[in-house]
A protein has these predicted regions:
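Intrinsically disordered, low-complexity peptide-like regions
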Residues: 4, 19-22
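Bacterial N-terminal signal peptides that target proteins for export
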Residues: 1-10
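Bacterial N-terminal signal peptides
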Residues: 10-20
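Extended amphipathic alpha-helical heptad-repeat regions
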Residues: 31-227
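Boundary at the C-terminal end of the N-terminal hydrophobic targeting segment
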Residues: 23-27
Length: 227
């Protein structure tokens, strides 16, 4: 009798589990989107808005930096002009000393000319660095603008995704809605390509700047520690 009751209890448990499994099979939660097919993932609007603010801030900083580098570039150009005039004056003085057979003075002027020419190389290297800094800040500003445009497109795409028409599948309204989503997705991706291109240009400008700074260091060392 005990064995029969135990078998009956097991049978009841199996029946209940089978019923629950059947119900779960019929009442399923919506499947999550296939991540392999999601080209542009849905993101919180707050995240996109925050990134737009960051991009604008980046652009403002780049524009402000460019103004400073422009001032330094113009100052470097002025210094080069003054140094070139100084060299011309020294060369004239050397020439006059040679004509007057003042060998010691001519030799002294020759040394001054070499020193001034070495300093001129430093100033020209500084100018190249300033010009490269301007180019980097311009590239940063262009990148920030492209990022803001791409995020704006993504923002419009997400807003469109969240406002589908209350129309059956295959209806004209639904077809127009899907076409609009596709267009926004395409324009968003195109703008993201532009962002990637701007990043590449910025990287090139930064590499050029680093190279010019190295040349400036070499020129400064040659001036301060002549062989």
């Amino acid at each position: 009798m005990i064995r029969y009751s135990h078998s009956l209890a097991l049978a009841c448990v199996a029946l209940v589990l089978g019923f629950v499994h059947c119900v779960n099979a019929q009442v399923q939660t919506p499947a999550s989107p296939d991540t392999l097919m999601t080209i542009i993932a849905v993101r919180p609007a707050a995240d996109i808005e925050r990134e737009i603010v960051d991009a604008r801030s980046m652009g403002d900083r780049a524009d402000l930096a460019k103004k400073g580098f422009d001032r330094e570039r113009k100052l470097a150009e002025t210094r080069i002009g003054l140094k070139e005039k100084e060299i011309e004056s020294l060369e004239l003085k050397q020439e006059m000393a040679e004509q007057q057979k003042k060998t010691a003075e001519a030799s002294a002027f020759e040394g001054d000319i070499k020193t001034a020419e070495s300093m001129l190389k430093v100033l020209k290297s500084q100018l190249s660095v300033r010009e490269a800094e301007v180019a980097v800040s311009e590239a940063q500003s262009a990148l920030a603008s492209a990022i803001e445009d791409a995020l704006g497109q993504e923002q419009r795409l997400q807003e469109k995704r969240l406002s589908p028409p209350k129309a059956p599948a295959g209806s004209p309204d639904q077809t127009m809605y899907l076409a609009a989503v596709d267009d926004l997705m395409k324009s968003t991706l195109e703008q993201q390509v532009t962002v990637a291109e701007k990043r590449g240009k910025l990287a090139d400008q930064e590499e050029e700047l680093a190279s010019l700074k190295l040349k400036l260091l070499e020129a400064q060392l040659a001036f301060s520690r002549p062989k």
